């Protein structure tokens, strides 16, 4: 057996095949969770039977995608998903993307489409993950805590990856994705705001990694019309986030809040501009809640409408 064959066999057996070990192009391991293909209607009642965007890469429908089980560490400018490590932190988007893509073909920074699918799956299945969002503990379940890996102002800051209880995993089981709630800030690829206009890399093409041009001037970025169709950025009537009456508002009109500062609020409290109906794509990419005023476990959205 190879250096990591026994590790891979053990990880697979202990998780019932739901976790896998994947090697990068220099033979170093990371542990991933396999996320099987799902439909929009399986996430939100009343939506279409279309397969979620996370499973469409370069016009090819995928049976699954693989998501890091653990928040990554960085070794020699490469990102690795391993348990009981102090996760990488204070890293910008470009460096995070590069660390993922440095591992070779197929490896990429987690995308907004993938993140959205997992979040919607958790809500549908009643397993919104708890986590280190209050100095090593969960703010709502204060008896739950992870193992400290760093201090912050004399209190627990970060926790070792995967050191919390199973409720800190996306499915509330040991074979799930750890630490999606809190611990460190995480970057996603494939979605950006430009002066409030929501722009995306279509489907899950951001998962193409280094083969996908996500530079500021890339022509791959598309805006979203009110009917859900994709158009060139700057087209009239595209979806935007505005800040209205102390809440994030989804609008297709002109932005009214033009202060260069971060604002945000509870995801459930987002509002719609008068006359606008949120298209399915907005709900599937977490641009607008599928159930306004519903229970999203206190999740927040933050944004800056300028720049």
Give a label for each model feature.
Residues 50-180, 184, 209, 225:
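Short aromatic-cysteine micro-motif
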Residues 1-20:
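Charged, compositionally biased non-catalytic regions
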Residues 123-128, 192, 201-203:
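Short secondary-structure boundary/capping segments
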Residues 9-14, 41-48, 155-157, 164-165:
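A short linear-motif detector with a strong N-terminal bias
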Residues 9, 94-95, 279, 283:
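Polar/charged alpha-helical tracts
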